Amino acid sequence: MAIHKIKFFAGRGSRYLAEKIVASYGTTLGNSEVQQFSDGEFQPCFNESIRGCTVFIIQSTFPPLDNLMELLMMIDAARRASAYKVIAVMPYFGWARQDRKDRPRVPIGAKLVANMLVAAGVDRIMTMDLHADQIQGFFDVPVDALYASGIFVPYIKSLNIEEIGRASCRERVFVPV
């Protein structure tokens, strides 16, 4: 079985998180940039070869529109640059609350976003705390839906806070000086 080099890249919406992720792996982010045009359009570019590599693109889709479009374009660029696999790491999956039709003549936004990611060429999705588990079924590629509660709940319990969630009135009320 061939071993493919792994490279990590960050979208502009998740650079801080991406730097923390790669630091924990003892590596650095790959070299990429986004060219901004005067009309508001932008064009991501990988400034190093990713041919044959497994590429992780770390990008939240909040605020959704520009970050989602940047992620889609980075996926497409990676695919066109002959990446072996393209994995989108999406800490926040925008439009996830639109997981069903709740009234007539409305879209199912989560399914549309899933279709766009697959059409762009993603091979796998990693995301956190999806609004609804059924969203995983909207994709034609594997989805790793991770849950922060597995990390946060044990930590919070370890603090031994007796009255968690019950702040005193004095702590919640702003009193001007």
Placement of each model-derived feature along the sequence:
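PRPP-associated nucleotide enzymes
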Residues: 1-172
